C-alpha cells in the first residue's frame, strides 16, 4: 500500500503525474468501432503566445469535459494545436529585427520567413508546455499547427474551390486599415473604444448663390478628399440648391451638391461632406452618384504627396487601374504630415479663412485595431474578399433548425446578428508570415491564375513570367477550417475524419463568436456538408477582484503559472469553475484559490487517515446490505445523489454546479461527518463493524475521487493510486453513475434527523461555552424515536450524552433544563447549573427569529403563483417540505421559550 506524505505538495506531484500520463499514452485516442466518439478541437492559441487566464479557464473547461467523457467510455479525442497568428507573430519578428537594425525589406521575403520560422521553433513550444502544466489531457500525438502541411493543403483547397465558384473575388473596396500594422483587417477585428473628440462645424460656400452651407465632421483632415456634399432631397431648407455646387475650402475646387438619403434631415444641419475614399458610408454614396474617389492618406498614416500621385497617375495611364481605383491627391503643404498633424494645420487654415464656425466637444466610438489598438482608417484598397451571403444563409438555417445550439442559449442572438449583418469578408493581409494567397499574375497579359500549386505558364498567353500575389490570408481563414483540417480533410477517405467528425463541443469565449465561431460553422457546412460541432459552450472572461478586465495598461493581469507555482494547478482549475455559470464573466479572487488549495489539503489528510486505518491484508469491496448501518446507507445515498446530479450538471455544461456539489460532498458529508462517525466503529472491539466502516470509507472515497478527477486531476490520480485495489490510472476508470440499489431514502431521512439534532446540541453548547468534557443526560421528545435509538453511540460521542430517555411527549419538570429544537425532535438537557438562564432565553429568541425568517422566505416563494406554476415540480415540493420543517422547528422553539417562563 502506497504511503502518502504528511502534507500535500503539488510541486512534488503534478509534473511527475503528468509525465506518467504521457508515458502511458492515456491521452491518445484511436477510432474504435465499439465506442462512441466524442471530439473537442482546442481553440488554437497563438504559437508565440503565453498562457493567460483566458486560456486557463477555456482549457480547464475542455479538460473537464474530455476527462468526463473518457471515463464514461467514449473514444474521447481532444485535438490540440497552435495558430500562426499572422499579425502578432510578424510584429514580434519585426520588433526583434529592428533591434538588429534590420527591416523586412532589407532581408527580403525569404530571409524574413526564415527568421519567422526560427522564431516559431524557439517560442512555439512555450504555450504547449504551459498548457501541460495546467493538466490538459490533449492527444499531443495529434498536435497541429495552422501552417503545417495538412492545414496548408486544406487552405489552398478551399481558396481554389471558392474562387472557382465565384465566391472569392479581388477588387477595390472599403476596408479597415491599420496604419501601424500596415495591413487590412476584417470587421470582426475592429474594436470600438469610447474617446473624447469634437464636431468641427465647417462652412462650404455655394458657388451659385454665395451662401454658406454648414456641416459638421469629426475628421476635418479628410476634407481634402471630399468629392461632394450631400443633402436630403426631401429637405425643404435646401430645395433651391438641387444641382448646385460648393467650392471646397483650401483647395478652391468645385464639387457637386448631391441629393441622397444618407443626409439625415433630423441631425445637425442636414448637410454632410462626402469623402468616398475614407468613409464606408461615403463610399456607398459615391457609388450611387458616380463620384470620383480621391485618396488623401498613405497606408502608413500620412498625407499623400507628389510621389504618391505620380504612382497612381502612372497606373491609370498604363490602363492598369481597376474598378473603383482611387485617384490620389498631392496634398501640397500638408503632404507627409501624419493625419493628426494635418488635422491641426488644416483647422488652423480653415479658421484663418473663415471656414471654421465652431467646435463642439463630444464622446464617440472610435474603431481601433484589436492587436495594436491604433485608430483604424477606412481606406479603399485592392483586396481579396469572400462573398458572405451565399455562405451565411445555410449557417443561419443550421442554427435555426437546432443542428447547433449555443450554451447559454442567449448567445444564439449574438451569432444571428453577426451572420445576418455581415459584409463580404476581406481575407487578404499585407503581411509575409502566413498562407500566401495562391494566385499568380501574368506579367505580360495581366491574367490572374488561381491554383493549388504554382503554374508553369499563363493559360491565356503562354508566358512563363508569373508573379505570385505577395499578400497572405487572414489568420481566421485557416482557423475557420480547424475542426476538419486537423482530422485529415480534404482527404475525405481519412479514417479520423470519418470517425471523429463532426466534432461535438466547442468551448470558447463570447468575444470570438463573430471572429471564429461563425466562420467555422459556414466553413464546415460549405466544405464538408456537415455542421462542425453540435454545441458551442460559451464562457465569460476572467476579471480581477474588482471586476475590471485584465490588461497591461491597468497592470492587473494574473499569471496562471505563478498561481500554479504557489497553489498548484488543481487549485487554480477548481477556483476557475467553482461557482461559475455558463457565459458569465468571473472574478479572480485569491481567497478562492486558497480555499481550493485548502480543499485539496482536506482531501489529502482524509485519505491519509483512511489509509492509516487499513490493515495490510485489506481487500476493498462494499459489504452486503445487511452489514450496513444507518450512517453507511446515508453516506452511500448521498454519494449516489451527487453522482446523478453531477452527471446531469455536466451534460448541461453546468461545471460550476458540479464542482460545488463534489466539494460539498467531500468536505461536509465525507470528511466532517462520515469520517468522524466512523471513528467509534473503527476503534470498537467489533471486528465486523470495524471492517464494514473501513470498506464503506474506501468505497466512498474511491467514487468521490473519480467524480472529482475531471476538476482536480493531479491530486485525485495520486490519491487513487494509493488506494488498495486501484487500477493503473484513475483516468480510464468508469464514471460513477446513479445506482438505484444504493438509494436508501428512508435511512437517509432518519439519519439526517439525528444529524440535525446533534448539530443543534453542539451549536447550543458552543454558544453557551460549555466544555466538551462536561457531559449530561438528556430527554428527547420525538414522534419518531427509532432513528435516535439506533444512533445512541453517536449521541454519546457527538451530543455528549451520558444517557438518553425517549418520549413522545415530555410533561415533566423543565427546571434547570436547556432545550434544543429541530423539526423532528426537542431535547431537554439538564445544564442550567452550567449556564445563565437569561443567556439561554436570548439564544432561544435568536433561534426563533432565524426560524421565522426561514419560514417567511419559504412562504413567500410558495405564495408566488409564478414560482409555483413555472418552477420544476421537484423544486416546489422541496420548498414545501422546508416550509413545513421550519414551522415545526418554530413551534418547538416557542414551547421551549414558554417552558423557561
Model-derived features with residue positions:
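N-terminal, positively charged nucleic-acid-binding surface of large information/translation enzymes
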Residues: 1-234, 275-288, 292-311, 343, ...
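Active-site-adjacent bridging/hinge elements
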Residues: 34-42, 64, 100-103, 128-135, ...
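Structured ligand/cofactor/substrate-binding pocket environments in proteins
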Residues: 54-66, 73, 82-83, 151-154, ...
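Secondary-structure transition/capping motifs at alpha-helix termini
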Residues: 67-75, 96-109, 129, 133-138, ...
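Short Cys/His-rich metal-coordination motifs, predominantly Zn2+-binding knuckles/fingers
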Residues: 181, 251, 372, 443-445, ...
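Feature 926 captures the class I aminoacyl-tRNA synthetase adenylation module centered on the KMSKS loop
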Residues: 201, 417-477, 481, 526-569, ...
